[in-house]
Amino acid sequence: MAALQALPLSIDQNAEVSGSQSHTNTRSPVTENTMGSVSSLISGRTYHDKQCKASELSNKCRKPTNMPNCFKQQEGLIKSNYSSQDPLFNGLPTKKPSTTTSGNNGNYVYVNEDFKEEWHEPRVPISPSSDAEDIREERALNGNIRGPPPKLIPVSGKLEKNVEKTLIKPTAFKPVVPKKRNSSLQYLVQRNGGPGLSESQSSLNLLFNGNAAGIPEKHNLLSCRNSTHSGTMSDSGRTSLSSLPTYSTNCSHQMDPVSVSMGHINLDNHTNINGYSDRAPRGRTRPTNSDSGRSSSSKSTGSLSGRGNPSSDSGSCDRSPILSDEILIRELEEKLKDREMELQQLKENLDENEAAICQVYEEKQKRCEQEMEELRQSCALKMKQAAQKAQRLQQVLQLQIFQLQQEKKKLQEDFSQLLQERELLEKRCASFEREQTEFGPRLEETKWEVCQKSGEISLLKQQLKDSQAELAQKSNEILLLRAQVREARSDLQISEEQVQELQDTAHTKTLELEVCENELQRKKNEAELLREKASKLDQEVAGLREAAVANLRHGLCLCHEKEDPFLLYESDEAKAQRQNADNLQGLQQYVERLREALTSERRRYQEQADSFEDERRIWQEEKEKVIRYQKQLQHNYIQMYQQNRELERDIKQLSLELEARELDEFDLHGAEIQFEEITATEI
């Protein structure tokens, strides 16, 4: 629950100022967040003192202040706590300054809020339990349609028991630290920036803003009222107005009803005190519903913040009291008695809710502080982001300015160049005009010459047409010849390719023949070597045969000594035959061994020759591939070169033909134009 806080009525007591002086709207400072008992709410001053104060107020320069509504009291507390240290509150919207007017039919000052509003606008006091942000949202959604104040949301643990049945009363409360019941009295009117009302006194503005039924205003019921009422109010509710003096002071001033936040009793007969009156009120009050929900307090308490009709600051001096003031005093005595009873009942209700309200207030204050800290951080972050964004935008703008300056310089240079070109063109135009004036007579002569040659031109035109037809025919023939030449070139190219291929094959064949001749020569050399080896082997065989024969003979000699007697009787021929057979067998074996070695050598040689032949064949194939690829590339290059040459010749020829046609058309067109002009001049 937010703290209830009111703004006091600060009236400067300067030197004597005339009643017609204009009043300025100022905003009073926020009062201290102090608490007091309910007994401090009742003023202990006499009515005579108040009459003296009222007489002094009219002669001073009054600076009325705004009396804030209940929903502004939370902002007042927050601003008083944070305005000195947080610059973010400078941007919060302030309430409109109040206007102070004095009525034609009264002697009291009415300090009202929003005096510029419509007189029929309803005023709904707002519960102190509602938050300022909730109030703003409700105003934004509902506009001027205002309903009863919202119920208090239970925050502390004490308020969660009977939420549906019982509602917290929007009454003043005192702090946890107890104080005396009879605290020092504080007056409503603060002089020269004195200390403001306590929060307990200012919070009673809600108590007296109960259900008040608006009664139509009766104007000019009383012509004048005196401000010389005196009386006393005590805590026990004893009120007696019988001892009030009825004499008037030297000068009585007309004042509007003052709407004070503590619900101070207004002595004007136009003020609605109990919510109903048989006399004319100063303005319509706003019907409200009390947050406590009690019918006894809501019906008995009235709104003292009503607005009075605007009137001029006019007063009359030395007026005598009238009978209506006495009747009003009696009615006020009865009303004050009822009010004292209500105050006693409110005192009883006050003590019941103080502890819970204090706890709720502390919790809400902590939440408000947290929200303000978050708001400060978010605002600082937004300011930082905005500064960074502004810096980036400044850099971008500087870059754009630099680019625009460069473009401006370029445009200035281009403009200067264009001016120079313009001057040159003007000079040329002037020279052309001079030449035109000079060539005028010559042009007339040339016209007559053109008339003479127009006939020749017509003949030349006919000849030109014939020549163009012949040229078209010749061009067709040329195209046919070109096609034939292209075909012949393609045939020639094909034949050249075939000849080249045949030359390549012949060259390869010659290379193969050379290789074969080399191989044959090598084979011959190898055969000679083999013959030499064979002759050497024959010689060796002959030597071996001789050695074998000698060995056989030596062996035979040795054998004869050991022969049996039977062999001795053999003939010499048989011995010779046997020796020859043995020698032949040995020679045959040796020859077989030599033949085997020769075949192995021949086989090895053949294998080497085959491997050499394979390598030679592979190398030859690769060589032929490379040669064929090179020939193909060379042929392609030659073909492309020839095609490019042909295309260049064709392009040149076509360009010449086009130029010739353009020249012919230009000549024909120019001749026709001149002829028409000449004909027109002759006509």
UniProtKB/Swiss-Prot annotation:
| Name of protein | Leucine zipper putative tumor suppressor 2 homolog
Coiled-coil residue spans: 324-665
Tell me, which GO biological process terms does this entry list? microtubule severing; mitotic cytokinesis; negative regulation of Wnt signaling pathway; nuclear export; spindle midzone assembly; Wnt signaling pathway
Mark out the compositionally biased spans (Low complexity). Answer: 290-308
Function text:
Negative regulator of katanin-mediated microtubule severing and release from the centrosome. Required for central spindle formation and the completion of cytokinesis. Negative regulator of the Wnt signaling pathway. Represses beta-catenin-mediated transcriptional activation by promoting the nuclear exclusion of beta-catenin.
Query: Where does the record say this protein resides?
Result: Cytoplasm; Cytoplasm, Cytoskeleton, Microtubule organizing center, Centrosome
Bias regions of kind Polar residues — which residues? 11-37, 96-107
* A Pfam family reported for this protein in Swiss-Prot or TrEMBL: Fez1
Q: Name one GO cellular component term.
A: microtubule
Q: Which family does it belong to?
A: Belongs to the LZTS2 family.
- The UniProt record lists the keyword Cytoplasm: yes
Q: Which domain of life is it from?
A: Eukaryota
Annotated region described as Disordered, given as residue ranges: 1-37, 82-107, 262-320
Which keywords does this chain's UniProt record carry?
Cell cycle, Cell division, Coiled coil, Cytoplasm, Cytoskeleton, Microtubule, Mitosis, Wnt signaling pathway
Name the major location: cytoplasm
Give me the gene this protein comes from: lzts2
